[in-house]
């Protein structure tokens, strides 16, 4: 089977490309001029230089594809806002529209729980039906939502689409990719204070995300979406587990988000004057104020997906991160 993949040099994309190529599929990956393509080439994956913002640059690689998997996204909250909109909204529309015009059989969007803007304020877990929490806490969340809506417009015209919504993804390899950077920061004692300690978040192991995507391709009917969410824990519980597993020094303080936000009003000019980044951005605090708890029962029952919990996924991750 011929598969065209965007985001193939990213955390999820690279792991997925390896799995698909290992299963004997012909994987064609869209890569930017600055991307490190060596890991893909070592897997025998053909690379095509381009950008989701440039529809014409994808035509050669996408032509003749049986599946298009769109996993590319701009996650950099410190970059220009227009760049994120162009990648996550216009880019998603470009990939889907070209797939439709080329007559691609199936389309899989690798979205994110960011699409939902968070989960209910009472801490209960949301499902694929939502509800969506607005206003969105970050530009990334808003653009992921808008990008998905753009893709769905092409489904109305006949493109056979499925969507997966991974939660916070962790696990080797990639010490600074996915949510490994957060775990690594706690393991190294880089967070002196804990904010949003009682907010609930879903964590999913990278291998389970890849397995979920493969099972969607094998089993899911067109039009179906699946949360790949994993275990729901509070940030406080997560930090305690990291402390037990890796001796991570727990943060000395637990601070209300409102207090941190007020403090940054005075601290931000000092950080800027010293050429340093503040420990929290306004958008990060917006996210920490919300729950991100999601229920992946649909993937477990309809796809037969087994999603490991943190007790199984954290030990190898901590071992990997401590060694890097």
Give a label for each model feature.
Residues 34-41, 45-90, 98:
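NAD(P)H-binding glycine-rich loop region in Rossmannoid oxidoreductase-like domains
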Residues 111, 148-172:
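Conserved beta-loop-beta element that borders a ligand/cofactor-binding pocket
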Residues 3-23:
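N-terminal Rossmann NAD(P)H-binding glycine-rich loop of SDR-like oxidoreductase domains
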Residues 90-139:
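Conserved Rossmann-fold NAD(P)-dependent oxidoreductase catalytic core, especially the SDR/UDP-sugar
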Residues 83-89, 126, 136-148, 168, ...:
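Short-chain dehydrogenase/reductase
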């Amino acid at each position: 089977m011929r598969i065209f993949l965007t985001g193939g040099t990213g955390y999820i994309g690279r792991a997925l490309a390896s799995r698909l190529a290992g299963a004997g599929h012909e994987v064609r990956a869209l890569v930017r001029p600055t991307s490190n393509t060596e890991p893909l080439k070592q897997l025998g994956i053909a690379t095509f230089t381009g950008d989701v913002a440039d529809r014409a640059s994808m035509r050669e690689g996408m032509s003749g594809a049986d599946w298009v998997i769109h996993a590319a996204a701009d996650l950099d909250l410190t970059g220009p806002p227009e760049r994120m909109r162009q990648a996550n909204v216009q880019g998603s529309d470009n990939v889907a529209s070209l797939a439709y015009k080329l007559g691609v059989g199936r389309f899989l969007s690798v979205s994110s729980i960011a699409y939902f803007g968070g989960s209910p304020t009472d801490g209960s877990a949301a499902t694929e039906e939502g509800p969506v929490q607005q206003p969105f806490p970050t530009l990334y969340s808003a653009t992921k939502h808008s990008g998905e809506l753009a893709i769905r417009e092409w489904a109305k015209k006949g493109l056979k689409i499925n969507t997966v919504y991974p939660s916070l993804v962790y696990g080797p390899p990639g010490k600074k990719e996915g949510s490994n950077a957060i775990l690594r920061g706690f393991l190294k004692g880089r967070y002196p204070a804990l904010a949003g300690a009682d907010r609930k978040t879903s964590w999913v192991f990278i291998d389970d995300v890849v397995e979920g995507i493969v099972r969607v391709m094998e089993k899911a009917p067109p039009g179906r979406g699946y949360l790949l969410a994993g275990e729901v824990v509070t940030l406080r519980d997560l930090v305690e587990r990291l402390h037990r597993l890796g001796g991570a020094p727990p943060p000395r303080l637990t601070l209300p988000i409102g207090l941190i936000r007020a403090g940054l009003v005075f601290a931000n000019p000092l950080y800027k004057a010293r050429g340093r980044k503040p420990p929290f951005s306004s958008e990060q605090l917006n996210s920490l104020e919300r729950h991100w708890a999601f229920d992946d029962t649909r993937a477990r029952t309809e796809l037969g997906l087994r999603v490991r919990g943190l007790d199984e996924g954290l030990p190898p991750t901590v071992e990997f991160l401590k060694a890097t």
